[in-house]
Amino acid sequence: MHPHEKLVRTCLTAISSGDVETWLSCYAADAVSEDVPFRSVWKGRTALEDGVRSWLKAIPDTRMDILSLHTNDHFGSCEWTMSGTLHGAVEGLPPEIAALAVGKQFSMQGATLYRFSADGRIQREALYWDLAGVLGQLGVLPTP
């Protein structure tokens, strides 16, 4: 197993178990995490820590499962599923919408693109997923 594959697996296992410290250890000190659908960007360790703690407070039962994962010495891609129950506000989701969805479960499929640092950590990641589909599951958008 490539070291970066192991790193991504460790990262997603940590978020699924609410292990903030292990999750943070996967990222370079100046890492950038961009959630494209939410237009949310966390830059640097403080923003990463604040962001993940806020996420886990809002969705404490977050579960991520890997569908496919490919890495090399510099880049990686991961297709995943995520599920959870919304318990509060999430960065990128207006509070009035979050309030309508509290207590509701969701699941989604998405993908993350990675760039790794010279010391073997995540330098940059960009997450892509179906925002409209999730909002439909949460009952705030009509479903087809």
Summary of predicted features, one role per range:
Residues 1-144:
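C-terminal and inter-domain tail/linker signature
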